[in-house]
């Protein structure tokens, strides 16, 4: 039976692993494909130490992002209500609809913090009144805000 070789991946490879993973592969696969294409590096103690340091930095970065998102969530839920003014027709029906871009602009105007409009979920709004929207600030952090649609 052939001996397996440990390599550290430099890129994500389908069905093998993602960047920074330590994997065992056949020596021929490593020697003939992974190493010449610079898709992997032989696993030496120095390389393993670098990989561990890179993972720790990534963990710290993700933790900092989550803490920043928690702070944004607190700010949004403290303000709680954001007002959007729209032109109104008969029976409090608004012209057009309230878009996620308009909600993002209202949040930015009130908090001076940019929010990605793609993370905002707004119900179908076609009348004036109060509506709830969710803002996804991070994969693990979601804030619920209230949108007031008022006449212009």
From Swiss-Prot:
This is Large ribosomal subunit protein bL9. Binds to the 23S rRNA. InterPro entries: Ribosomal_bL9, Ribosomal_bL9/RNase_H1_N, Ribosomal_bL9_bac/chp, Ribosomal_bL9_C, Ribosomal_bL9_C_sf, Ribosomal_bL9_N, Ribosomal_bL9_N_sf. Belongs to the bacterial ribosomal protein bL9 family. The keyword RNA-binding applies. GO terms for cellular component: ribonucleoprotein complex; ribosome. Keywords: Ribonucleoprotein, Ribosomal protein, RNA-binding, rRNA-binding. HAMAP family: Ribosomal_bL9. One of its GO terms (molecular function) is rRNA binding. GO terms for biological process: translation. It comes from the Bacteria. The lineage of its organism: Bacteria, Bacillati, Cyanobacteriota, Cyanophyceae, Oscillatoriophycideae.
